Amino acid sequence: MSNVFSLLLAREARLLFRRPAELANPLVFFAIVIALFPLAVGPESQLLQTLSPGLVWVAALLAVLLSLEGLFRSDFEDGSMEQWVLSPHPLALLVLAKVLAHWLFSGLALVLMSPLFALMLGLPARCIPVLLLSLLLGTPVLSLLGAVGAALTVGLKRGGLLLALLILPLYIPVLILGSGALQASLQGLPSSGHLLWLASLTALALTLTPFAIAAGLKISVGE
């Protein structure tokens, strides 16, 4: 079973490398949002520093959401998704490999580039470890929850708006905990409580969402 997971993970990685625009779009979006915000609110460093925890997390959330609409699109259109559903291997395991590959090449890249843009907003260097850890724990949850919506809307021609309406309410706890951890660190308070809750959400999402994604794909393929 682990061999199948590894093979599918490698396959998805190769496919993503062939479509560099899909990898670059959310990262460019994240960078543009962060770069434009100081132009909108003014150059006051104290104001930017105060707003930076929420801004970084909202930009990351929207960047992840932007990348999810086409997550299963190509597999659905070329018939690969039907083969997945008919495969003797657990569909939940197959979709977990696909979502993991997506996160490794988009979500993880976003996590790694976030300190640079956070420093641009005046976030102190002492807060960077909390920023990295919160995004490292939170962005997989965003990808997994978003994949549930992507699975349900993959058969729709214009499912982007519906995907956002379905998934954004589910993102609220992650947004509150992630930005809360960063805000606590900015104020010199312990952020371990927020991070532990984020870790719990990550474990819960890894356990439950693959089955929800598999069920959503079966519904979409069967329509």
UniProtKB/Swiss-Prot annotation:
Transmembrane segments annotated in the record for this chain: 23-43, 52-72, 103-123, 128-148, 161-181, 195-215
Q: Does the keyword Transmembrane apply?
A: yes
Q: Classify the protein's membrane topology as the record does.
A: Multi-pass membrane protein
Gene Ontology molecular functions: heme transmembrane transporter activity
Matches recorded under Pfam families: CcmB
Q: Which coarse location class applies to the principal site listed for this UniProt protein? A: membrane
- CC annotations in GO: plasma membrane
Q: Which family does it belong to?
A: Belongs to the CcmB/CycW/HelB family.
- Please give the function described in this protein's UniProt entry: Required for the export of heme to the periplasm for the biogenesis of c-type cytochromes.
Q: What is this protein called?
A: Heme exporter protein B
Gene designation per UniProt: ccmB
